[in-house]
Amino acid sequence: MTKTYIAFHKPNGILSTMSDPEGRPCLGDYFSNREERLFHVGRLDKESEGLILLSNDGAWAQEMSHPSFEVVKRYRVLLDRALDPKDLRAIKSGVALEDGIVKVVAIKAQQRNVEIAIHEGRNHIIRRLMEALGYRVERLLREEFGSIKLGELPAGRWRHLSSTELRKL
């Protein structure tokens, strides 16, 4: 079987699962015409959008998802209000949540717009980080997964990864 590697722009409101017993919209709805089974690399919560990788190579998908590889993921976040400079400093130092300290790789903020890079994949990590500091995330978009970029790929569309992109991962 030929190995397939896909970059998909997950729209807001879609579950990061290949099927849902309750019939809610999910990733599998976009790939139901494919014969091979696809595995998603990591997850984005239902309210988040952006780049998610899929493959019929289960071992690769599991490897890319494993925290030990510390793959950096970059996000664009829109907050309900401007990020205070003291909170920006706190995020750079590390913020304690109930399941441990969150350390970011990089962060830039301009008013309500925040660009954040993180290699952790804990559940709702960016939303929980911002909520711990008193902010509400209005939009969360994953723009990069390692060296793979979302670019201009429209929501709900997908493309194959190039051999160059796969090598760089």
Where are these regions (language model features)?
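Basic, flexible Lys/Arg- and Gly-enriched helix-loop patches that mediate nucleic-acid binding at interfaces
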Residues: 1-169
